[in-house]
């Protein structure tokens, strides 16, 4: 199986993360207009699997980095809480099968596994509603403490993933730990969390910040509810990162592609023209692809490049790998594409006219699957 090779010098060898672990259902709404505050609307219950953020990001990282392969492969440790229910057991098994080490995921005796309802419009866009009283909210400082020796041992070679669907206060504690140990701190925030995250100083504890257009507008805009043009957001992000040289930003522009910004400079990577099956999980797939590229030691962006079409791209940056992964992800009805694998991504890129650079090929290798005996058991 083709995977990316983690790079100890100039890249990363493991990821430890907190965020939502759970599952949900998807509805395809009838009609293009946005769901109203007091509206009841028919929708088709889809035969599609929805998942929560840490699971999605962790799955793609584990698959693309070959975490279920040789013992020296990239390690992924999620930290979280699920319910003692069928959904929790199923999610645990799926994450373990993808190659994640589940020793820091525990079950709660009374609270249910995090669940969500995703709704999709006919054009493939949509949103979701996620339970706020699930087992995920029971994540505690003790859970972080249990994983802290691994964070300390990894040091600057470790990625600290900090994504939504767990309390902001715990995310602050996690980022403080990551800062103490020199981890590379990767964050995303839901739209409704941006102001509180700013107030709590979480942005200043971030090395890589991934936002969609609405979330970036809340961070960089002039007034609440205003959604800025993606080009303008990239300009403002460039000004922000010029003053914060440690901060990198990913700004998704939806079906158009994504921007990567660092040190006052940016790159725009266009996405292939597609009719998406579902955009659920696409932003998480984008983030995961970028993290994988950085772990393999390829550049985050090619500064001041702006591709006109995906078909003309020679893929060589972490941003471009992220856009490729996100684009591939929307060809599935599921929030995690069941066929996510590096060789499939490369074939998809070539099918849509892009090519893989020699520098990207050079950080890939064929890896052998490890024994199932090394997979943690659910307790």
Task: Walk through the language-model features, giving the residues of each.
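Glycine-rich phosphate/adenosyl-contacting loop at the front of the ribokinase-like
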Residues: 1-93, 97, 276, 356-379
